[in-house]
Amino acid sequence: MILVLLTYKVELSEIDALRPAHVDWLKQGLADGRLLMAGRKVPVTGGLFMARGTLDEVKAWAAGDPFATAGAADYDFIEVAPSILAPGLESLGQ
């Protein structure tokens, strides 16, 4: 599993203009089984998502995010090997 932290590099007005396409991209990731969860940082300085796949696979997938293609965010990728999981989240350890 890969945790991806996004930090916005542009004004929120630019992020807001890109957000509908970004959300569509995230929804496609859910449908494809790649995306596990996504959300905004509080305060709104970026966001994060968790994705299935190898580091290289997730980096390649994230390159298609409209925030990435517009150069609107920096991405930090953290590979995670879950070992303790709440009930119902066991599949994240696979």
Where do the model's predicted regions map?
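Conserved, structured core segments of small domains
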Residues: M1-Q94
